[in-house]
Amino acid sequence: MKNLMDFCLGTVSFMILGSSLLLGSSDWALGGFIGKPSWDLFLHFENYDWSSFVFNLVFCATAATIVSGAMAERTKFSAYCVYSAIISLLIYPIEAHWIWNPGGWLVKLGFHDFAGSCAIHMVGGISALIGAALLGPRIGKFNKDENGKVVKVHTFPGHNLPLGALGVFILWFGWYGFNGAAATSVEQLGSIFLTTTIAPALATVSCMIFTWLKYGKPDVSMCLNASLAGLVAITAPCDTVDAFGAAIIGIVAGLLVVFGVWLCDHALHVDDPVGAVAVHGVNGIWGTIAVGLFSTTTVPGNDTLNGLFYGGGIHPLLIQLLGFAAVAAWTAVTITIVFLIIKKTMGLRVSEEEEIKGLDPTEHGLPTAYADFLTTK
């Protein structure tokens, strides 16, 4: 239901204001900071860029839906609807305007994010981290001593690992469209497909080897997240890196996802049930930075951008770092304000009784989401 509303409420928000803030002219005010609000979708439909609206809407909804996993099992549905709509209305469109609108200030500086490691995944990951931190952990996640120090972290296994694996396979397949949709030639599309295959594959292998060595067994759920981490990391540089660059990006992503999960659980004590922060936040940052390291003009369609390791100097890396910092700051400030307002007014979290009983009956009036487990007398 939450993922459904991400897209449906996101469509409403993007239609009302978000699309014009992203796609509108930058010349009207603030020098590339925000697009000019307009109702061209309704007033000048015959001349509107319909395909661009749909293309950017899907990206917008993706940023919003990342947050749900980190706040699972204890968030009010009403609160979820509010912040999801605001992400699509204001938070995502403005920073995406900086990155993808020809008049955006980051575009003018030379910042590069082909398909959204920064604009989509990092934004979703940062929002997820802040939301989960303000919401608090699920009941029983952390054991604390008399001084309030966390002494034990409990793992709650997912209810259906094969279904989760199927989701990863579907996402991986869909990512070829996600990354390849903006290709301008067949050669560039082929190169993007190749890097989009190499990075998640190497990420999964590196994660498997690492968890095998560390825990004595390869961690299935961590490897599934590593596949997604590799996809997230390659999303920004998929059109500017070669096979070697994609391989290194993937290997690092597979290790970073393990580190990100550890960071949330044992250092920050933030309860992220699905690893959204590690997958999207940490590897969104890594993918953004990787553009400034591994880009090469030997790749079809990339005639100008060389990274630090390919003779381009430090300037491209500094631009990527600036862009990451600006978008991260914008996202952190705005989503924190949104969450705090919701928390002080309608409330973010369900009651302890509702959480223990489960959100299916308390939020949606369902005995359970899994009818096969119902028994009749």
Residue map of PLM features:
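Glycine- and aromatic-enriched membrane alpha-helices
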Residues: M1-K377
